[in-house]
Amino acid sequence: MDLHQSPTARLLQKWCSHESPFGCRRHYNSRKKLKLIRVIGLVMGLVAVSTVPFSISAFTETDSQSNRGEASDMSGPRVAQGHRQRTLLDLNDKIRDYTPQPPASQEDQAENSTEHTQGDYPKDIFSLEERRKGAIILHVIGMIYMFIALAIVCDEFFVPSLTVITEKLGISDDVAGATFMAAGGSAPELFTSLIGVFIAHSNVGIGTIVGSAVFNILFVIGMCALFSREILNLTWWPLFRDVSFYIVDLLMLITFFLDNVIMWWESLLLLTAYFAYVVFMKFNVQVERWVKQMISRNNVIKVTVPEAQAKSPTAGDKDGPTLPSKPRLQRGGSSASLHNSLMRNSIFQLMIHTLDPLAEELGSYGKLKYYDTMTEEGRFREKASILHKIAKKKCQVDENERQNGAANHVEKIELPNSTSTEVEMTPSSEASEPVQNGNLSHNIEAADAPKATETAEEEDDQPLSLSWPTNTRKQATFLIVFPIVFPLWITLPDVRKPASRKFFPITFFGSITWIAVFSYLMVWWAHQVGETIGISEEIMGLTILAAGTSIPDLITSVIVARKGLGDMAVSSSVGSNIFDITVGLPLPWLLYTIIHRFSPVTVSSNGLFCAIVLLFIMLLFVILSIALCKWRMNKILGFIMFGLYFVFLVVSVLLEDKVLVCPVSI
């Protein structure tokens, strides 16, 4: 038997006879492990490959059913209809062809399924063949142009008119931020949902709102974490507050989606959840204060500045806590409650939250002579500019403190603030002493603060101007946006002008009209793009439309995060979606049921249902990721958010195209 063995086998047997049993056993175990790895890899490869024929067989079965229907009637329109069904993965088409029992409450919708498939859009000047040969580029450019138009009309006209309305009605900042200002930031999504229900007769509105929600949670937070100038510490209360409401709203939405239809009372329940959030925001400060008093580690600490201590050259306890070398622009883990509605109500995308990142440390910033005439946005930008000056001057102040010693004189300036605290600001001086406020030690040159605030007033709070810019890049941008801005400037009064302030109703209703027109064109051209390249409106809503309508939120959140306001950026990303889920979706549904004699709305889309479930799962992953990053917005958190967003897009598209089958069937 030894004669028939190969030389390699004889050499191995000889080596094992001379080596210790352990050496031979190690060699045998390594071969065994390699064999196990190969088997596992083979099984995984078979599983991955098996998904392809399963998906192909599903499409083949669908096509065979449609082909059998075509064989009975080979007329031209029937063939064209079958061709549309193969290129557009629209669930309504498939239900029309082979679903045996449509919902009884939607009989009128089933009779007009052809119109619902195409939507109530005007006839395109380009045929499908011409669009496939290159004319679709014009539709893509027009769709992007509508993204810019929606951002401009909301930014320059709609939100300022809402600010005037809240001031006229005397609504508190918290309630205004959760109602009027939330509507201003989410107007594109709301009108897209209305168009999807009444004009497109598709789920494009649901896809846009769900995709926008994931974009705000994952992509926006990821961008804020990557582009912030420093690692930002986050606090738990704003995130806990908004996530709690958002989880309840998502669970309600998932439950209502289970039977493929939305009843009128289900829409009403979602709207009721929104009003509950508004009521909570009315008492947000009191609730937060009570909750943190119940939790010993987060007790609210009130810091007061004695008059004598503030003016004393040697004021300050050397053993007491001092401010870090660079003042933080967000709340730390042990900081007190910092809610200030003026800080929150200034930027329209962030109007749902009440956060004053420096109320504990800085109190208020000084009442300027033009403070009462400024809009909420101008007040925020003014304060943000002062904060920026404080951060820039801190290092110089510390150096002057060590070299020059005591201050000659301290000037007290009182400013309006919900916390009713005071701040000491020192005028310009070569030798100055810092004012110490518990853990605060700041020295600000008085000459710089007016300059900063005047600059913020001049640049950010001025009415819209159509003057020709001097910079070449700005001139090119001006030419691009001029066809949008000029009609708005002609038809809508700018309420930021004192003389036009009384015309705020015209601006309000006119802005709504323009938003409706821009949203209609955006959805129409997105439908044409999807029809040309062969994807459904639901996928367009989940991807392109969701990102396009959320660009203003992205830009504002990144700017706020770069200023150091990490809490405001993160909590707004979660809280801004509450309006979309509890108003943007149920309001069009409720209007539809009322108009159609309380008949339910069909939302039969297995891909979108799983997308909503994925949205809920991604929200849990966001909370877990923030906790694992120790409540800090760093680069790792940013890359995690980007990875989760990519996974959501891929899985959602595969589910909507039936390449993957949702494990939860409806």
Swiss-Prot record:
UniProt repeat feature Alpha-, residue ranges: 175-215, 546-577
Main location as per UniProt: membrane
Entry's localization field: Cell membrane
Record-listed Phosphoserine modification sites: S337, S341
Reported phenotype of the disruption mutant: Mice display a significant reduction in Ca(2+) flux in cortical neurons, leading to a profound loss of long term potentiation and an increase in long term depression at hippocampal Schaffer/CA1 synapses, and clear deficits in specific tests of motor learning and spatial working memory. Mice do not show any obvious loss of photoreceptor function in cones.
Function: Calcium, potassium:sodium antiporter that transports 1 Ca(2+) and 1 K(+) in exchange for 4 Na(+). Required for learming and memory by regulating neuronal Ca(2+), which is essential for the development of synaptic plasticity.
Family as reported in the entry's similarity comment: Belongs to the Ca(2+):cation antiporter (CaCA) (TC 2.A.19) family. SLC24A subfamily.
Name assigned to this protein: Sodium/potassium/calcium exchanger 2
Species, as recorded: Mus musculus (Mouse)
Lineage, broadest ranks: Eukaryota, Metazoa, Chordata, Craniata, Vertebrata
Name of the gene this protein is made from: Slc24a2
